[in-house]
Every structure is written in C-alpha cells, then in structure tokens.
Amino acid sequence: TNVTPEMSYRFAKGETISNGVRDMTLAEPLDFYAVTDHAILLGMANLWADPTSDVGRHPKAKPYHNLNRPENLSSESAFNRFLLFNDIRGDSGGFPRERGSILDIIRAFFAQNFIFASAAYDHEEHLSAWKKIMEAAEEHNDPGKFTTFNAYEWTVRNQEPESASYHRNVIFKSSKAPKRPFSSFDSNNPEELWNWMDGLRSDGLDSLAIPHNPNGSNGQVFKKYKFDAVSYTHLRAH
C-alpha cells in the first residue's frame, strides 16, 4: 500500500524503488506500462491504516492500523501484510465486507452501488485514488518513448469448492476514463463487466479486458458454461 502510481511509473522507466522488503530495479526500462491496481476498495487501505480517519476508527480496521509505518514494512511483517491483502480481495469475511449503517444501506440501494453499504468504504477517497492513477498516467506518458494507459484490475475470487482467482486487467484506449472503475462490488460476473465495457464503447470510450493469472483459475478460463450455468453448446444450437 506504500507504492504510489507515481512511484510505479518511475520504476517502469528504470528507477529503483522499495517494495517494503527490499529495493527493486528493472533490468531494462519498459516501453509501455499501466498501473492496474485492484478496483475493489481502491484507496481504502491507507484510510484503514490511519486510526484517526472515519473508517479507520471502526473496530475491525484495527489490524490495518499503522500498516505503512517503517517498522511494518519489513520482511518479518511481509506475511501478515499478505494475509491482509487476501482479506481485501476476498469475497467474504473480514472488515472489507462489514456491513455499514442502515443509512449506508439505503444510500447503496438508491445509488444502485452496493459498495456504499460497506462500513469500510469512503466514496471520496475511492474517487481520489482513481483520479491519482489517471493523473500519473497522463504525467508520465511520453509519445514515442514511453506509453502509459489508464487501467485497473477487476478482481474476483470464487467461493468454495472452486476457490478460483481469475481477474481481468481493464485497459482504456485513450486518455479518458470512467468516473470510477467497475469492480466485483458491482458484480462478480465477468459478463456484466463486459456489458459495462460495451456501454462505455457506445459512448466512445474503448477498452480491453485482459485475463490475468489464469494459472490460479482452477479451470475457469476454459469453462463450458456461462456464468448463469447455460452451456455454450446449447446457446450455439439455439
């Protein structure tokens, strides 16, 4: 959580940065790059780490407190940070899935945005984090030398027995981008992600969803059925 989009681009162009455990430098600078941070609860970890923030004062935010302090950015604390990361991207349990107040739930209903119902969520911080990703891409884009993209990762993990992690890196074609990214809080159905992308395309904003880490998909890359369990063979026959 301590590496910013700005730092990521400097790393891609050959600078040395720290990942909290050791220094890292690429063998060769890259020609193009995109920051594909996880859209689900984007920007929230820094608030959870701050015990003075509104969401950081929640009792279940305590494991995240002071997450980015220097003494917590060591090899000894790496495993604990990994567990907290899994808590963020998981589809059940933990602070990220803690239900908010009845007012939060009502707001989520009328906004048709269920992330508002989470006690762990701050909408303005979420939009701010997304804006910083876009600003960093714009700042570091150098046509003909180093190409950047507005992008993010749609992150979803299935429940048991599959326990599959099968994500998509969503890359936007132009310097424009939607107000906020579509995350698994909106839907864990990839077909609805594609429908959202089609809607953006109709408005002139093209994008591409690239399957990410299919090795952890437990066979979901080559499913014979749609998300609603209708077989592709049946669809082709009708």
Residue ranges with predicted function:
Residues T1-R236:
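Extended, charged catalytic domains and RNA/DNA-binding interfaces, predominantly
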